[in-house]
A protein has these predicted regions:
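Helix-loop junctions on the cytosolic side of multi-pass membrane transporters
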Residues: 125, 132-159, 348-357
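Short amphipathic helix-loop junctions that connect adjacent transmembrane helices
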Residues: 1-5, 197-211
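C-terminal ends and interior cores of transmembrane alpha-helices
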Residues: 42-55, 249-262
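Substrate-agnostic recognition of the 12-TM MFS/MFS-like secondary transporter fold
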Residues: 9-26, 35, 40-43, 59, ...
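Juxtamembrane intracellular "pre-TM" segments in multi-pass secondary transporters
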Residues: 147-183
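Helix-boundary and loop/linker segments of multi-pass membrane transporters
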Residues: 156-157, 169-175, 206, 258-260, ...
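Primarily residues marking transmembrane-helix entry/exit sites
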Residues: 3, 57, 61, 164, ...
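A helix-boundary/kink motif common to multi-pass secondary transporters
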Residues: 2, 32-33, 56, 124-125, ...
Length: 357
């Protein structure tokens, strides 16, 4: 597959998430966070089953769509459940720390499996996909074992459509602080997520053997896990605003470093994006949780994820085409300028809305 095909495939995943994201978050607020996560966990098992049997590009697209639906039903509900669980036990102030731990656990798992993935592929190309099935089943079993904190009854509204429209208006128009946090999360999220899909062709272009892709990926995600674990302490030392400004400055550092480097050692600049992801994720998740209405917490988090995914659906294929047309180095230079402007443009309204942070 060309890079355009790869980016198009990921755009299909993101498009499915876009279609399911806000409805799934709204449903989680109505029927319960755990119930939504059960749907997501079941979809993951089904998606990896389809992937393991895929024999055509179309079937792979179908698998990505099923996985995308699963991601949508998990997104928002998992973090909302974490928030209400901590609040119920009097530990709401520790959310950033636990959010970082949750992200670190996921990234550590990805680091370990990435290191083994290439080796498993050499044994049998479909083996990594088959092994995803019991892993997804274990995740589903973990969700089944969860217990949800009972919540007060939601404020009655005339219809679900009216309630959903109320959430959209509140988050995107009425609540300036929430809107600013969402915009910054999208700008920083897309800036770093694009490199997740460009780093392998970048390494190939710098002469790094494919056998090293897994170890490099694993090392990067191990670093991301460490940053996520340290995010609460970093925020405590420097404050929210200074830490997020640092995240914005990591965007040009990462893109410029990768673009200008001509040797394999340039891959070290990829850690700028891992650092960005490890810091901004827990910080902005907490900000959005604090500003979200209690009855619509998962809806707000899902809306933020929807905006991020929609941005990638729009930007992904053109970025892949840009790399195919002008080459990796020139494309990275262009992306560095565009994403730096976007990140700083989103950071300024955030500082005005959250001046005390």
């Amino acid at each position: 597959m060309s890079l355009t095909d790869v980016m198009t495939l990921q755009a299909a995943f993101s498009l499915t998430v876009v279609l399911c994201e806000f409805p799934s978050g709204y449903l989680a607020d109505r029927i319960g966070y755990r119930a939504s996560m059960l749907v997501g966990g079941g979809s993951w098992v089904a998606g990896w089953l389809v992937y393991a049997w895929a024999a055509s590009f179309g079937t792979v697209v179908l698998a990505e769509m099923i996985l995308g639906a699963g991601a949508a039903f998990m997104s928002g509900a998992d973090r909302a459940l974490l928030w209400v669980s901590l609040e119920a036990t009097g530990r709401g102030g520790q959310y950033t720390r636990w959010e970082g731990r949750m992200r670190a656990a996921g990234q550590t798992s990805e680091a370990v499996t990435s290191a083994a993935g290439g080796w498993l592929y050499t044994i049998k190309p479909r083996l990594p996909f088959w092994l995803q099935i019991p892993a997804a089943a274990l995740g589903l079993a973990s969700i089944i074992a969860l217990r949800e904190i009972p919540r007060p009854a939601a404020t009655p509204h005339r219809s679900h459509l009216e309630r959903a429209w109320h959430v959209l208006r509140f988050a995107l128009w009425r609540q300036r602080r929430l809107r600013a946090a969402m915009a910054l999360a999208v700008a920083l999220g897309v800036s770093s997520f694009v490199m997740v899909w460009l780093i392998q062709p970048y390494m190939r272009g710098r002469g790094i053997p494919p056998s090293w892709f897994g170890p490099v990926w694993a090392a990067a995600h191990a670093w991301l896990a460490l940053v996520s674990l340290a995010s609460a302490r970093i925020v405590g030392a420097f404050g929210v605003r200074a830490t997020l400004l640092g995240c914005c400055l990591l965007v040009p550092l990462g893109y410029a470093g990768l673009s200008a480097s001509t040797s394999a050692a340039g891959v070290v600049f990829y850690l700028a994006f891992m650092t960005l992801r490890g810091l901004q994720g827990p910080i902005l998740a907490r900000v959005m949780q604090e500003e979200a209405p209690p009855d619509d917490r998962a809806s707000v988090l899902s809306l933020a994820a929807l905006l991020f995914r929609l941005s990638f659906v729009i930007a992904g294929p053109p970025i892949g085409a840009l790399v195919d047309r002008v080459g990796m180095d020139a494309a990275l230079a262009v992306l560095g300028v565009v994403f730096t402007i976007a990140s700083l443009a989103a950071f300024l309204p955030f500082t005005r809305a959250h001046g005390h942070a």
